């Protein structure tokens, strides 16, 4: 990375719209630390230029002819793993495709403000530049195992949940144990390595705070639910926190738990520059669950969640940080480790078992 400090970040722009290629190039090159070394009109052209130009970062449109963004990403990760920032639409189809791409190994995404050809793309300039710079410093991780999992039927989930409630008598009561997972850049891929490996009868509730804008967290929750034995969905105000269920904070809202054990959503100011913020959820749940809370911090930029993890460790709770060896961006977990707030530091593929073990003790 030392040479990247001295030279601009080399970016390849892949989009089937000539207008969007021009706009993205202008926006990126408005920053002196970025240079666009090439553009491609579709996925096949993009793949050839990745191999030819060997860029530091690729921006990749989701919807393209010949070879779409997802297919192109799969080939890039197989043939020359490169940090990729997806450029997607706000449509349901665009969100679903984006989540699949993030699960496969894309570093991050930028949503087009107004459809596939966005005349106002300039409003996303700062986000685009920041995410390309972050991607240049990221480590591309080829994620395949969770993506290939067979979907789990709703009937299997209901049977497992009914069995859990018979065994524990939880019903709608507050679960004895709670797991809070926080993540940012690279988080969707990490979550696809963890959530599908949790048992349907996990004797704990699970809350997930992923830094992500509105419109995409629902697709993330739906995709995880399809692949997982445990039930997963986007949290709604008033939802009870239950054992055997994963609730994902909706983009644009802080997620809290009220005195009755129900989800409360808050659009107060961003904390650490993000909303939802992991530390806001920590402040809400730590006084209730105390040492019965399990905190997990995964890949991501910044330090959100570190304060909550330090308080949880002090309270006697179990804390897990993702190891640098599997992080896309070793930021949030690094701060947790440096604070001495992690009881375990584990590669992502070991975290589901660690969670299951932690909530099964006491």
From Swiss-Prot:
Q: How is this chain modified after translation?
A: Phosphorylated by CheA. Phosphorylation of the N-terminal regulatory domain activates the methylesterase activity.
Which residues carry out catalysis?
184, 211, 304
What note about domains is in the entry?
Contains a C-terminal catalytic domain, and an N-terminal region which modulates catalytic activity.
Q: Which organism is it from?
A: Symbiobacterium thermophilum (strain DSM 24528 / JCM 14929 / IAM 14863 / T)
Q: Which Pfam families match?
A: CheB_methylest, Response_reg
Keyword Zinc listed? The answer is no
* Name the record gives this protein: Protein-glutamate methylesterase/protein-glutamine glutaminase
Q: What class of enzyme is it?
A: hydrolase
Could you tell me the keywords of this UniProt record? Answer: Chemotaxis, Cytoplasm, Hydrolase, Phosphoprotein
Cite a GO CC annotation: cytoplasm
> Which SMART domains does this one have?
REC (SM00448)
The places in or outside the cell where this protein is found are: Cytoplasm
Q: Which gene encodes it?
A: cheB
Q: Which family does it belong to?
A: Belongs to the CheB family.
Tell me, which GO biological process terms does this entry list?
Answer: chemotaxis
